[in-house]
Amino acid sequence: MSNVTSVMTANPACCTPQTSLRDVARMMIQNDCGQIPVVDDQNAPLGVVTDRDIAVRIVAEGRDTNVACAADAMSSPAQTVREDSSLKDAVCLMEAAKIRRVPVVNASGRLSGIVSIADIALAGKKTATAEVVKEVSEPGSARA
């Protein structure tokens, strides 16, 4: 079975905990994605900000979006897979954590990519993807 590097999006947009949510949202628009990894100064993932995190943790709570930053909305710690992880390992993590995207880290723990259900589906792993979509889409799913 292929590993995650064969299907991941390499060098994804990322931000720091101090990045304004307005800038995070702009990154999502510019990169046509719903998740931005939050990294430290060594580019190691600390967490992720999803469009759902912004809606639920900031907007729905009535917090000021003009002063909120990535750290205020991020899901942490980041669930990650290593570059040498199999697609099956990524699917299992997505299913267990009820997530649709997983940051990929290199041997040093630095962000190198993101793998998503869509990436796996496009790679022809439709059976595994259908099962993950079913699992993460059930009512009560924790996060997008």
Language model segments and positions:
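Tandem CBS (Cystathionine beta-synthase) repeat/Bateman regulatory domains
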Residues: 1-144
